[in-house]
Amino acid sequence: MAVSLSWYGVSTFRLEVDDTVVFLDAYLDRVPGAPPVGLTAAQVQRADYLLVGHAHFDHLADAGTIAGNTGATLIANFESIRLAAEAGVPEDRLMPVSGGEPIALADDLRVRVFPGLHSCVWSGGMRAADEAALGDDAVTHQQRRARMGGGGTLPPGLHSTRGDGGALGYLLENRHGSI
């Protein structure tokens, strides 16, 4: 069994297990001024699946390009799927999930989907590297919405007021182990 894992910054990884290529999130083409990651979405030659954590730009932005160029299937929450469909990804390449679904990716590779919680970077500071962050950042839903409404320095359209559709986590498994 051959396995390789490459990191492309933020939360984007390329996982290859034997002949199956899986992208975990799809954010390769950076906003202006950000350093490049060594690969653009247009340069991706092969992908079988895209597993997207939620519908924020830094997870989903290049899913349409990668799916369009490679024929990859996008597995994501319903908001991510809606945005991908609006961007022109064909329905037969879209697999909406919400958590609990086991999905066969290859003969000896499957993924289990889990619902998750997304942290809020507008919560008033980052925790120390050795401090656990378990999701309770003492910020109310109303405070979070108000802080996100400001938009900060993000270009228009990169953050939706509709939210992220709910965060998802993925566990990939085969007979040798899991990641």
Q: In which residue ranges do the predicted regions lie?
A:
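Alpha-helix capping/helix-boundary segments
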Residues: F57, S80-I81
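Short gly/pro-enriched beta-turn/loop segments at secondary-structure junctions
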Residues: G163-A167, N174-G177
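Short beta-strand scaffold segments in enzyme catalytic cores
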Residues: T12-L15, L168-L172
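Pre-active-site segment of Zn-dependent metallo-hydrolases
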Residues: R14-H56, A61-G68, E91, S119-G163
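Short acidic-hydrophobic, aromatic-tinged amphipathic segments that line or gate anion-handling sites
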Residues: R93-S98, A104
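Beta-strand-turn-beta hairpins that frame and shape the catalytic cleft
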Residues: M1-L5, E16-V22, P102-R112, E173-I179
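Catalytic phosphate/metal-binding cores of nucleic-acid and nucleotide-processing enzymes, i.e., regions
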Residues: F57, I75, A87, D92-L94
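Short internal beta-strands
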Residues: A72-E79
